[in-house]
């Protein structure tokens, strides 16, 4: 019988016509810039302590949104989550802030910037380095590998490969050093790459 070849031919014709009719713009959209990544991962203060609302607000307050939106940039950015900023504020202003909501933590970050203008910019630039460092590289470098940040200070990377993370040693010897959050690695952008981290990197000993 010739029914099976006819069905196959008809199916091929339908497939070919569908492909031919697909619009040229149907290709996958390019990834967003680092600013777009941060906008997508953050927003207004909410009840989720493990996104990046407070960092997004800090970037805006520090006037760094355009730098992260620059298509010519080529950066690795470490993203402290909201809980990381809560820990920073509690360390600066007292342990009662462990019971505060995100909006209150944000108000204290604004207070910090008001009392010492440029502080947020300094801190945020300490979280960015030139070039793209993916998690595979971060987990394979020698322990204590230095990275020079855009702020000018140094962060040292020490892999803990069996846990799928790395510790980032900052300039504050008395705090808990942040580590890469395994579920927030290799967030791709058109102008760089980002990794979530557990605490805020500190460019000075607080």
Model-derived features: positions:
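Mature, structured domains of secreted/extracytosolic soluble proteins
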Residues: 3-9, 16-18, 22-206
């Amino acid at each position: 019988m010739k029914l099976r070849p006819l069905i196959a031919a008809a199916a091929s014709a339908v497939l070919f016509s569908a492909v031919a009719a697909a619009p040229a713009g149907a290709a996958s959209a390019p990834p967003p810039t680092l600013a777009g990544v941060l906008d997508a991962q953050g927003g207004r203060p909410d009840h989720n302590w493990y996104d990046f609302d407070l960092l997004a607000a800090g970037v805006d307050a520090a006037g760094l949104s355009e730098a992260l939106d620059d298509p010519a940039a080529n950066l690795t950015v470490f993203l402290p989550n909201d809980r990381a900023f809560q820990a920073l504020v509690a360390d600066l202003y007292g342990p009662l802030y462990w019971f505060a909501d995100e909006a209150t933590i944000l108000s204290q970050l604004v207070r910090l910037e008001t009392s010492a203008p440029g502080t947020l910019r300094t801190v945020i630039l300490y979280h960015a380095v030139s070039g793209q460092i993916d998690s595979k590289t971060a987990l394979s470098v020698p322990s204590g590998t230095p990275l020079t940040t855009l702020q000018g200070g140094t962060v040292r990377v020490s892999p803990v490969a069996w846990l799928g993370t790395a510790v980032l040693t900052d300039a504050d010897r008395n705090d808990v050093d942040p580590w890469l959050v395994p579920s927030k690695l290799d967030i791709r952008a058109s102008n760089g790459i980002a990794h979530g981290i557990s605490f805020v990197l500190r460019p000075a000993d607080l």
